[in-house]
Amino acid sequence: MSKSKTKTDKRNQSSLSRIKLSALHYCMSDAEPSIAYLQDNSAFINNEWHNLVLEKIFPVYNPSTEEDITQVSEKSQHDSTEEDITQVSEKSQHDDDKAVVDISERGRLLNILADLIERDRDILAAIEHLDNGKPFDEAYLLDLASVLKELRYTAGWADKLHGTLRFAITIPTFQDLRFLRYTRHEPVGVCGEIIPWNIPLLMYIWKIGPALAAGNTVVLKPEELTPLTALTVATLIKEAGFPPGVVNVVSGYGPTAGAACLSHKDNDKLAFTGSTLVGKVVMKAAAKSNLKKVTLELGGKSPMIVFIDADLDWAVENAHFGVFFNQGQCCIAQSRITVHESIYDEIVERDLEKAKKQVLGNPFESDTRYGPQILKIEFDSIPRLINSAKAEGAKVLCGGGRDDSCVGYYIQPTVFADVTDEMRIAKEEIFGPVITISRFKSVDEAIKRVDNTKYGLAAYVFTKDKAIRISAALKAGTVWVNCVHVASYQIPFGGNKNSGMGRELGEYGLE
């Protein structure tokens, strides 16, 4: 049995390696929609490609090699195209000849898009690997799988969004006249959507899927450093048969292209995933322009509480997957771990042993599970936060800086012990591969301390018999019990406090 499984695993690994090489070769060719093709086509408007103001170009680089892989041009408020992008989207929204207004057609088109993404799964994974730096296997097996599940789930909702009907409403003051009362669910309109750089393709689908299922049109701006999968999927939008103007994608920087999206008075809704600092800018812009509806998924400083009755091996395994997944560049990463004092030393020892086994290297290699930081600015800022923890008395068990053995933006997997709540590293979002471990004495103390933060995106509880009580007490949008990052697209996701407002995914995300 074990030999058969080993042979199967080797065949699967060999097959995935061939897929990787083929996809990478295609991405670097001149074919549509290869990276070279996107260099001259940086905006997708009204189902047509536009090359924007050529003087406004910016590079897209591979963070694992620090080399530029292409460049794209920027859309700004002063660029002139055939029609204003938002006006194109608004016109499509109200055009009865557009197939997207038919609820059954919406679901059909979304399912076709899912089929096309599955067909090009290897190419999209390779592009995500190149401009995001994440291991190819992770992009192919995890990100693309999640993309397909979310898109097909959302497609199923398209013809099930309807209002309610009430008959025979009697109003005595009007001589017992009987009235018909009903509600309608109508599309919001034009949705301006801005996605982040850490998981760009999945966030793209989180944004456009529900918007299109509900009958809206979209103007989407990807992060300027990771725009390639968003632009690539735009070609599939057209191939799937979506009418012109339903989905529009523009590249560019936040203060220019992003600001244009935020301030446009014909945009009816804003959906933003990113930092809390920028989220507040989004709120102000929405209020200043036309009081747009806003959904914000912002930063986090998620806690993980390990109680004495927890399965310690499982807790440590999940702690490392959750924090080191995507090199810590995940808003729900549980970088703030607090452990009951009676098991503190054992957890620290196991964490250290696990962290030392992390494999850094070329994210295109199959045995690599740990890639580079995506942004140079994060690569520079994370060591400063690590150094502040050292200065404040936290104990570095392993890591603690850049990894000079690799070319690229690599930070060593880092574990801190003896962390107190007053330290910067216990309060600020790191967005890097850093675990902090502290101890607690009682249940009430643990709850009080982990809730003492401005964030409220996620929390994690590892216990056998305290799950309901603890999860109900924590002020977080999502609480995972004895697991981490388990995705379910039927369940809403979003944050409390400075971690955002509104919900994505599930039925709530469509509302």
Swiss-Prot record:
GO cellular component: mitochondrial matrix
Classification via SUPFAM superfamilies: ALDH-like
The enzyme's E.C. designation: 1.2.1.3
Reactions listed under catalytic activity: an aldehyde + NAD(+) + H2O = a carboxylate + NADH + 2 H(+)
InterPro entries, A to Z: Ald_DH/histidinol_DH, Ald_DH_C, Ald_DH_CS_CYS, Ald_DH_CS_GLU, Ald_DH_N, Aldehyde_DH_dom, Aldehyde_DH_NAD(P)
Pathway(s) annotated for this protein in UniProt: Alcohol metabolism; ethanol degradation; acetate from ethanol: step 2/2
PROSITE patterns noted in UniProt: ALDEHYDE_DEHYDR_CYS, ALDEHYDE_DEHYDR_GLU
Region (Disordered) location: 72-92
Keywords: Mitochondrion, NAD, Oxidoreductase, Transit peptide
GO biological process assignments: aldehyde metabolic process; ethanol catabolic process
Binding site for NAD(+): G274, S275, T276, L277, V278, G279
Transit peptide: 1-21
Site residues, Transition state stabilizer: N198
Catalytic center residues: E297, C331
A Pfam family recorded for this sequence: Aldedh
Similarity comment: family membership: Belongs to the aldehyde dehydrogenase family.
Protein name: Aldehyde dehydrogenase 2, mitochondrial
